[in-house]
C-alpha cells in the first residue's frame, strides 16, 4: 500500500492538501537553511510536505519506507521522509541533497559519488548521498547494514561502495580524446545535489488537475452500466471519463518504430475488461484526495465473463476468448480464436532423426517467473495545452517520439500539434517503452482544457504495469560422443497476459539469438505467445532472451555432464564463428545481421582463466555446505530488427562549444555521456564543452528511442556522422578565410579543429628569385610554416555552422557475454553464497570503461535478483499478491557480490569508433550460470526461477 499526503491508504498515489482544512495544523521548521511554515493534514508525511513546498530534491519511490529514495536528514539523522510524520517537524532542521551542497560547492560525499560514477539513472542518488553523508570512516566496514534502507536498481552497488570509500573511477578528458576514457557524466553534480529534474520535478502549473482510476475488480467482465452522477456532484471534480468518452481507435501500449509490430487490441477505456485493475473509469479533480473520493462514488454494473489464467489452457479448444471479436486482418492477432497473439513453428534438418541417432540426449522443461522492472521512479505524465493550443506531455518515457506518434494516431491529431518530452527518467529496463499514462492524460486534458497529472503508485507498478513475460521452455538436445551438437529443439510458451504489447516481438526475439549462437544441422523452434486474464506482460531487459537462454544454457551444461566434457570446451566446439550463418530454423532467411566483429572466443578464455584464479572469499565450512562452479554464454544483436532511426544535429556555438540535438532519452543507459564523448573526440574538444538537447519532439530531430540497446550504435553513430560533417564545414570555411585550400596543399599541413577555432598551417615564401628568364633562377624556396588560428567569431561571421547526421539501424552486428559463478550452497537451508562472479563482454571499442563496467554490474545484479528471489505472485484468479517492495525483494547492497568484469579486445566495423551496445546483454547469461553452479554443488538441477531457498532446500533433499 502507499501513503498519500493525507495519511489515507490507497493505490493511486500521493494527494495534495488542497481543500483539506478540518483538523489540520501548521508546522514551522528549517529546510536546507530556510524556514518553512507549512500546512499539515492529519497523517501527512514529511515527503509530501517537502514536495508540496517545491523541494524536488526529495524523490518518491515507494511511499512505504522501503527504498530510501526519499531519504533526508532530520537534525542530522537519516530518515525515510515518506513515513516520517509531518506533525513532528516543529522546530526541527531538515537537510536534503540540495542542502548538503551545490554543483559549484558540493559536499565531499557528493563529489565522491561523481568521481566514482556512483549512479546510473540517479533517481536513488539524492537519498543515497544523504544517507552516506552521515557515515564515518569506521562505518565503511558496515555498509551492508547501514545501506539496507537504500535500494539502487541500476548500479550493482560496487561504484556506490567505491564512492563511500573514497575510490575514484573517473578521469579528466584529454582534448579530442574523450572516447575511450572513463569521463564523468555531464549531469553528475546536478544529480548528486538533487537538482537534476526528473519527470515531476518542476513547479506544477496553476489549476493542475489530478487523475484517480477505478480499476476492474474482475479478471474478465463487460461493463453493463456505469453511473457517474454521484462522483460528478462531489466538490472539485471536473470530469469522470468512461468508455463512452474514449476514442474508438484500437492501439497497443507497446511502442516500436513500426506500430504494426504490436497488435491493435486495446482502447484508452474499454467496455470489456480483461484483467484485474484494468481501467474502468478515470476521475479528474482538483486534488488527489478529491479524485479518490469521487472514484469511490462511481457505481458500475458488470457482467462477469469466464476467465483463463494458464497459457496452456488458454490455447485449448473451448477456452474463454479474450479478443475473439477481433480479426487478424485488423488487429494483427495471429489466432484470436485460440488466444494466440503470435506463433512460430519452423525446422531445418530433421530433429527427431537426429535425436534418435545421437550418442547423448538431454531433455528438460524450465519455467521462468513474472518479474517487475523495479524502476524507482514510477510512471508519470503531466499534460497541458500550450498558448497555441498544442498538446504538451511531459512524461517518463524511453520513447518520446513514438509516444507522440501514437497519441496523434489514437486521438486523430496532427503530429505537429503534439509535443512530448522527457527530462531525466528514473530507470526503464523496457518498462517505459510503453504508453501507460500518456493516453489517459491526453483524454483528460482534451476533455477539461486544464493541465492534468497522472502518477502511478508503487502498488500500480505491481498491479497494472506490464511485467517480464513468464515462460515455459522445453529444450531437447542431441550430440555425438565428441560433443558435436546434432539436434536442438526449443518449445517455448509464454504468457503475454490480457494484451499483446510486445507479445510478438518478445516471442520472436527470445528464440532468435539464443538458438542462432549454436551451430547445429537440425534445429526446430515451436513458440507461441498466448493471451490470459493475467495482467499484461511487456518489454524487459533482454527482451525474452534471458528466459530462453536460462533453459538452453542449463541444457547445454547438462549435456556436458552427460558427455564428460568441460562446459567451456563444449561451447567452444559448437558456437558460431565468423563465416557461419546465424541460423534459427531457416538457413535461407534474409537478414541484416552480420559479423561486425567477434569476441566470443576471447570472452570464453577470459572467464575460464579468471575462474581458475584464487577465490575472493573462502567457502563456508561445515558438513552441509557444498561448492560448485558454473558458466553460461549469450549472444545478442546490437540493435533491434525492422529499423531503428536517429536524426541528429551538431552546431558550433559562439563561445566555441557545441550544441548537439538527439532524441534519445537518458534513464541510466549512459548515452548522454557517450554522446558528448563522441562529439568531443570528433571536434577536438572536451565533453564539458558539449551541451545536449535531447528527448524532446520540439527541440530534437526524430529518434525511435532508447530501447534495444540502440543509444550508442544508432544515435551515437548518427552523432558521429554529424560531428564529422560539421568538422569538414568548419575546415572549409577556415580555409576560405585563410586564403584557400591551395595554400594547404602546397606545403602546409592539414587544418585542425581545436578549442577556439580551426588552426590552418601553410608554407611561407622565403628568399627571392633571380630575374625572369635568368639562367641561375631557382624559383622560390619554402620558408618557415605560417600558422593561423581562424577564430570562432570569424567562422560564424559567415553564418551558422550546423550539420546533421542520420542512421537507420541497419545492418546489425552481434555482441557476446560469458558469465561464471563459484557458489556455496547450504543443503540444510537452501542458502546460496556467491563466492565468485565473473563476466566477460565483447563490446567492441569500449568508449567509457567505468560506465560500461557499471552497466555490466547492474545487469548482473538485476539478474541475480531474478535468479534467486524476485517473483511477482498471482493467485489462481489473476489477483496480484505482490504489491509493495517489502514483499518483492529487490537486490540490496548486502545481496550482490562484486563482479569481476573483463572486456574482449575487438573493433566493430558497424558501431561508432568500433563500439557495440551493452546495456541489455549482461543480464542474459547470469541466471543459467548461477543455476549451473548450483547444479554442480548439489548434484541436482534447478528447473524453475527463482531458485529460492525453499525450492533449493526441497531440491537438495
Give the residues covered by each predicted segment.
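Helix-loop-helix junctions that connect adjacent transmembrane helices in secondary transporters/permeases
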Residues: 321-411, 575-657, 881-892, 900-902
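Thiamine diphosphate
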Residues: 428-449, 453-455, 671-678
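Extended active-site and interfacial segments that coordinate phosphate-rich ligands
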Residues: 189-190, 211, 296-309, 398-401, ...
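Glycine-rich loop/linker segments at domain edges
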Residues: 117, 181, 187-193, 255-263, ...
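C-terminal catalytic domains of large/alpha subunits in multi-subunit enzymes
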Residues: 244, 412-417, 447-452, 506-638, ...
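Phosphate/diphosphate-binding loops
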Residues: 279, 286, 450-496, 717-752
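Flexible, low-hydrophobicity surface segments
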Residues: 165-333
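Signature of N-terminal electron-transfer/Fe-S-associated modules in redox systems
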Residues: 2-176, 193
Amino acid at each position: 500500500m502507499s501513503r498519500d499526503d493525507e495519511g489515507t491508504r490507497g493505490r493511486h498515489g500521493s494527494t495534495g492538501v488542497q481543500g483539506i482544512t478540518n483538523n489540520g495544523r501548521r508546522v514551522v521548521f528549517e529546510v536546507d537553511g530556510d524556514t518553512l511554515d507549512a500546512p499539515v493534514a492529519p497523517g501527512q508525511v514529511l515527503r509530501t510536505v517537502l514536495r508540496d513546498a517545491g523541494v524536488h530534491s526529495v524523490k518518491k519511490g515507494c511511499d512505504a519506507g522501503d527504498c530510501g529514495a526519499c531519504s533526508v536528514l532530520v537534525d542530522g539523522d537519516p530518515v525515510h521522509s515518506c513515513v516520517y510524520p509531518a506533525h513532528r517537524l516543529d522546530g526541527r532542521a531538515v537537510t536534503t541533497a540540495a542542502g548538503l551542497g551545490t554543483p559549484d560547492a558540493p559536499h565531499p560525499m557528493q563529489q565522491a559519488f561523481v568521481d566514482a560514477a556512483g549512479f546510473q539513472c540517479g533517481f536513488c542518488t539524492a537519498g543515497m548521498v544523504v544517507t552516506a553523508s552521515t557515515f564515518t570512516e569506521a562505518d565503511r566496514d558496515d555498509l551492508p547494514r547501514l545501506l539496507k534502507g537504500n535500494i539502487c536498481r541500476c548500479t550493482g552497488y560496487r561504484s556506490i561502495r567505491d564512492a563511500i570509500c573514497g575510490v575514484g573511477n573517473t578521469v579528466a578528458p584529454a582534448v579530442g580524446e574523450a572516447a575511450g576514457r572513463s569521463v564523468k557524466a555531464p549531469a553528475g553534480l546536478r544529480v548528486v545535489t538533487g537538482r537534476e529534474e526528473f519527470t515531476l520535478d518542476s513547479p506544477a502549473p496553476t489549476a493542475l488537475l489530478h487523475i484517480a482510476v477505478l480499476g476492474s475488480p474482475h479478471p474478465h467482465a463487460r461493463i453493463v452500466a456505469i453511473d457517474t452522477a454521484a462522483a460528478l456532484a462531489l466538490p472539485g471534480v471536473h470530469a469522470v471519463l468512461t468508455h463512452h468518452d474514449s476514442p474508438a481507435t484500437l492501439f497497443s501500449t507497446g511502442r516500436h518504430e513500426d506500430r504494426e509490430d504490436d497488435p491493435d487490441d486495446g482502447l484508452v477505456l474499454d467496455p470489456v475488461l480483461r484483467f484485474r485493475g484494468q481501467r474502468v473509469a478515470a476521475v479528474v479533480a482538483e486534488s488527489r484526495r478529491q479524485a479518490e473520493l469521487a472514484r469511490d462514488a462511481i457505481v458500475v454494473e458488470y457482467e462477469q465473463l469466464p476467465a483463463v489464467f494458464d497459457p496452456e489452457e488458454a490455447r485449448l479448444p473451448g477456452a474463454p476468448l479474450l479478443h475473439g471479436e477481433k480479426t487478424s486482418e485488423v488487429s494483427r492477432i495471429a489466432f484470436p480464436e485460440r488466444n494466440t497473439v503470435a506463433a512460430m513453428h519452423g525446422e531445418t534438418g530433421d530433429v527427431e532423426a537426429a535425436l534418435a541417432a545421437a550418442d547423448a540426449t538431454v531433455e528438460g522443461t524450465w519455467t521462468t517467473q513474472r518479474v517487475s522492472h523495479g524502476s524507482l521512479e514510477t510512471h508519470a505524465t503531466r499534460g497541458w495545452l500550450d498558448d497555441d493550443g498544442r498538446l504538451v506531455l511531459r512524461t517518463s518515457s524511453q520513447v518520446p517520439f513514438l509516444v507522440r506518434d501514437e497519441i496523434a494516431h489514437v486521438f486523430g491529431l496532427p503530429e505537429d500539434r503534439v509535443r512530448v518530452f522527457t527530462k531525466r527518467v528514473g530507470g526503464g529496463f523496457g518498462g517505459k517503452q510503453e504508453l501507460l499514462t500518456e493516453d489517459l492524460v491526453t483524454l483528460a486534458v482534451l476533455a477539461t482544457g486544464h493541465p492534468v497529472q497522472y502518477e502511478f503508485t508503487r502498488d500500480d507498478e505491481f498491479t497494472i504495469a506490464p511485467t517480464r513475460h513468464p515462460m515455459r521452455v522445453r529444450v531437447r538436445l542431441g550430440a555425438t560422443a565428441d560433443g558435436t551438437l546434432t539436434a536442438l529443439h526449443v518449445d517455448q510458451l509464454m504468457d503475454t497476459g490480457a494484451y499483446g504489447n510486445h507479445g510478438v516481438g518478445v516471442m520472436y526475439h527470445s528464440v532468435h539469438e539464443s538458438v542462432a549462437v549454436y551451430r547445429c544441422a537440425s534445429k526446430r523452434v515451436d513458440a507461441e505467445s498466448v493471451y490470459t486474464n493475467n495482467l499484461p506482460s511487456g518489454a524487459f531487459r533482454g527482451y525474452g532472451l534471458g528466459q530462453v537462454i536460462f533453459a538452453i544454457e542449463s541444457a547445454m551444461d547438462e549435456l556436458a555432464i552427460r558427455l564428460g566434457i568441460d562446459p567451456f570446451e563444449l561451447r567452444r566446439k559448437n558456437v558460431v564463428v565468423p563465416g557461419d550463418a546465424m541460423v534459427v530454423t531457416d538457413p535461407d532467411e534474409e537478414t541484416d545481421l552480420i559479423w561486425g566483429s567477434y569476441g566470443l572466443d576471447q570472452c570464453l578464455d577470459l572467464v575460464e582463466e579468471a575462474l581458475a584464479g584464487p577465490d575472493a572469499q573462502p567457502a563456508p565450512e561445515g558438513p552441509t555446505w557444498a561448492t560448485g562452479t558454473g558458466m553460461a554464454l549469450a549472444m545478442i544483436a546490437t540493435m533491434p530488427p525492422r529499423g531503428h532511426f536517429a536524426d541528429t544535429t551538431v552546431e558550433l556555438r559562439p563561445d566555441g562549444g557545441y550544441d548537439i540535438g538527439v532524441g534519445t532519452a537518458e534513464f541510466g543507459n549512459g548515452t548522454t555521456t557517450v554522446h558528448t564523448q563522441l562529439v568531443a573526440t570528433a571536434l577536438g574538444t572536451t565533453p564539458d564543452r558539449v551541451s545536449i538537447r535531447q528527448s524532446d519532439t520540439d527541440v530534437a530531430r526524430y529518434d525511435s528511442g532508447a530501447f534495444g540497446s540502440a543509444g550508442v550504435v544508432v544515435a551515437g553513430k548518427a552523432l558521429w556522422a554529424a560531428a564529422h560533417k560539421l568538422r569538414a564545414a568548419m575546415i572549409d570555411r577556415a580555409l576560405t578565410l585563410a586564403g584557400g585550400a591551395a595554400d594547404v596543399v602546397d606545403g602546409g599541413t592539414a587544418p585542425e579543429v581545436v578549442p577556439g577555432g580551426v588552426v590552418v598551417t601553410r608554407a611561407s615564401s622565403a628568399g627571392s628569385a633571380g630575374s625572369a628568364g635568368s639562367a641561375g633562377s631557382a624559383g622560390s624556396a619554402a620558408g618557415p610554416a605560417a600558422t593561423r588560428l581562424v577564430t570562432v567569431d570569424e567562422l560564424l561571421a559567415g553564418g551558422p555552422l550546423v550539420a546533421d547526421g542520420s542512421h537507420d539501424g541497419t545492418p546489425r552486428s552481434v555482441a557476446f557475454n560469458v558469465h561464471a559463478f563459484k557458489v556455496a550452497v547450504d543443503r540444510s537451508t537452501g542458502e546460496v553464497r556467491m563466492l565468485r562472479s565473473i563476466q566477460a563482454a565483447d563490446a567492441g571499442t569500449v568508449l567509457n570503461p567505468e560506465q560500461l563496467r557499471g552497466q555490466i554490474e547492474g545487469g548482473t545484479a538485476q539478474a541475480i535478483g531474478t535468479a534467486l528471489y524476485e517473483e511477482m505472485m498471482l493467485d489462481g484468479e489473476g489477483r496480484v499478491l505482490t504489491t509493495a517492495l517489502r514483499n518483492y525483494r529487490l537486490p540490496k547492497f548486502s545481496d550482490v557480490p562484486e563482479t569481476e568484469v573483463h572486456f574482449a579486445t575487438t573493433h566493430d566495423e558497424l558501431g561508432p569508433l568500433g563500439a557495440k551496445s551493452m546495456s541489455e546483454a549482461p543480464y542474459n547469461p547470469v541466471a543459467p550460470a548461477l543455476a549451473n553452479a548450483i547444479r554442480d554443488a548439489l548434484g541436482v538441477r534447478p528447473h524453475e526461477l527463482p531458485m529460492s531457498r525453499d525450492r533449493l532446500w526441497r531440491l537438495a533433499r
